Structures are given as structure tokens and as C-alpha cells.
Curated annotation (Swiss-Prot):
<keyword id="KW-0217">Developmental protein</keyword>
<feature type="region of interest" description="Disordered">
    <location>
        <begin position="22"/>
        <end position="92"/>
    </location>
</feature>
<dbReference type="GO" id="GO:0000981">
    <property type="term" value="F:DNA-binding transcription factor activity, RNA polymerase II-specific"/>
</dbReference>
<dbReference type="GO" id="GO:2000382">
    <property type="term" value="P:positive regulation of mesoderm development"/>
</dbReference>
<dbReference type="GO" id="GO:0000987">
    <property type="term" value="F:cis-regulatory region sequence-specific DNA binding"/>
</dbReference>
<dbReference type="InterPro" id="IPR017970">
    <property type="entry name" value="Homeobox_CS"/>
</dbReference>
<dbReference type="GO" id="GO:0002244">
    <property type="term" value="P:hematopoietic progenitor cell differentiation"/>
</dbReference>
<feature type="compositionally biased region" description="Pro residues">
    <location>
        <begin position="61"/>
        <end position="76"/>
    </location>
</feature>
<dbReference type="GO" id="GO:0001706">
    <property type="term" value="P:endoderm formation"/>
</dbReference>
<dbReference type="GO" id="GO:1990837">
    <property type="term" value="F:sequence-specific double-stranded DNA binding"/>
</dbReference>
<keyword id="KW-0371">Homeobox</keyword>
<dbReference type="GO" id="GO:0007507">
    <property type="term" value="P:heart development"/>
</dbReference>
<dbReference type="GO" id="GO:0042074">
    <property type="term" value="P:cell migration involved in gastrulation"/>
</dbReference>
<feature type="compositionally biased region" description="Pro residues">
    <location>
        <begin position="30"/>
        <end position="47"/>
    </location>
</feature>
<dbReference type="GO" id="GO:0007492">
    <property type="term" value="P:endoderm development"/>
</dbReference>
<dbReference type="GO" id="GO:0000978">
    <property type="term" value="F:RNA polymerase II cis-regulatory region sequence-specific DNA binding"/>
</dbReference>
<dbReference type="GO" id="GO:0005654">
    <property type="term" value="C:nucleoplasm"/>
</dbReference>
Length: 232
């Protein structure tokens, strides 16, 4: 009985005079808790650093960014694919347009801006595409002229492969014929006389005849084109 009373007395003295807590790590002394604080339930455990930072009056600050290795992958290096508007579209020429352009090319290989604009109005093609066509046509003509200067086979070798009585035909030089250029005959009274009858026969054999519709279109186009040359 006496032992129980002594323990109750010690508990009452401890509640009335609680011991001071040790100094906090921050250096500030916490006030002693009141006797009623011992009877209250303990607060839930929370994040210690954030509570301590708020107690000292400092903002914990934003969270550190994630490491670079965990970020989104960088896009692959290199030139981006060209869009559909940046891609060059190939121009398809009709048979009438090609015949007219070849006809003008036989007259002049370097048409000026006025002639190109007239061709653009007749063929319904952009003037820039007509200029590119003449550039490509001049390059093609230079390549073909370079091939024409290649040495031909010796006459005695050709005679060995010819049948008897056909030596004169074998001695005739076999020059490459350009169908798209020579298909159109020289117009009478413009820039010269009539071409050789033998060359006209070769052109007639190698070229396919034009239809009446295309021929009528070319005739009407020639009148407009030749008027642009003047005294050419």
C-alpha cells in the first residue's frame, strides 16, 4: 500500500515539473511543454525536414529537377524531311508542246524573256519551266554533238560486210538522226530555203505522222511564234 502511494506521488511530481528537452539541432531552445500537453495525443508523424524548415521560417524550395538521363530522348540529328510543298514537281509536256518547243529551238537556242513569255502563253506552261527546258535541251544537244565527232569505221571494213552491188550505199555515212528535232520541216520563206529532198525522205521515214488536230495547232502556233522573230 505504501509502495503504491509513493509511485503515485512521484508521477504527480513528474507531471507538475517536467524535465526540459535537449536543445534542438538548430540551436533554438524549445519552450517547456505545459502539463496539459502530456494528456493530448501525439501528433501524426510527418516529413521532418519540411516541418523543421517551416519552423525556422525558411521555404523548402522547389524539388530538384530529374537527372538528364531520365528525360525524354532527344530528336535524331540530321536534316528534316522536305515537305510536300518543297518538293519539285515534274512537268509533263504534251506532244504539241514538245513539237512547238523543238521548232523554236531550231531557230534560236537562247530565247529571250519576251519569246519565253509568248511560249508560256501558247503552251500554258510556266515561263520558268520553259527556261529550264531550253537549258536541258542545250545540254542534250552538246552531248549529241560530242558523240557525232567520234571516228567512223574505215571504208574498207564496211565494204567487206556489204553485199555485191551495194558498195555505194555502204559508203554513205550513217549519221544519227534526231527524231524530235528533224520531224518538223523548215517553213518556206522563213530563215532559209527548202531543205534537201534526201533529208526530207529520211525524216519522213523516221518520224511518225502527226494527227490533223496537232498539225492545225502547230500551224496556228507557228504564225504567232514566227511573228516574234521578225527578220530572223
Amino acid at each position: 500500500m505504501a509502495t503504491a502511494e509513493s509511485r503515485a506521488l512521484q508521477f504527480a511530481e513528474g507531471a507538475a515539473f517536467p524535465a526540459y528537452r535537449a536543445p534542438h539541432a538548430g540551436g533554438a531552445l524549445l519552450p517547456p511543454p505545459s502539463p496539459a500537453a502530456a494528456l493530448l495525443p501525439a501528433p501524426p508523424a510527418g516529413p521532418g525536414p519540411a516541418t523543421f524548415a517551416g519552423f525556422l521560417g525558411r521555404d523548402p524550395g522547389p524539388a530538384p529537377p530529374p537527372p538528364a538521363s531520365l528525360g525524354s530522348p532527344a530528336p535524331p540529328k540530321g536534316a528534316a524531311a522536305p515537305s510536300a510543298s518543297q518538293r519539285r514537281k515534274r512537268t509533263s509536256f504534251s506532244a504539241e508542246q514538245l513539237q512547238l518547243l523543238e521548232l523554236v529551238f531550231r531557230r534560236t537556242r537562247y530565247p529571250d524573256i519576251h519569246l519565253r513569255e509568248r511560249l508560256a502563253a501558247l503552251t500554258l506552261l510556266p515561263e520558268s519551266r520553259i527556261q529550264v527546258w531550253f537549258q536541258n535541251r542545250r545540254a542534250k544537244s552538246r552531248r549529241q554533238s560530242g558523240k557525232s565527232f567520234q571516228p567512223l569505221a574505215r571504208p574498207e571494213i564496211i565494204l567487206n560486210h556489204c553485199a555485191p552491188g551495194t558498195e555505194t550505199k555502204c559508203l554513205k555515212p550513217q549519221l544519227p538522226l534526231e527524231v524530235d528535232v528533224n520531224c518538223l520541216p523548215e517553213p518556206n520563206g522563213v530563215g532559209g530555203g527548202i531543205s534537201d529532198s534526201s533529208s526530207q525522205g529520211q525524216n519522213f521515214e523516221t518520224c511518225s505522222p502527226l494527227s490533223e488536230d496537232i498539225g492545225s495547232k502547230l500551224d496556228s502556233w507557228e504564225e504567232h511564234i514566227f511573228s516574234a522573230f521578225g527578220n530572223f
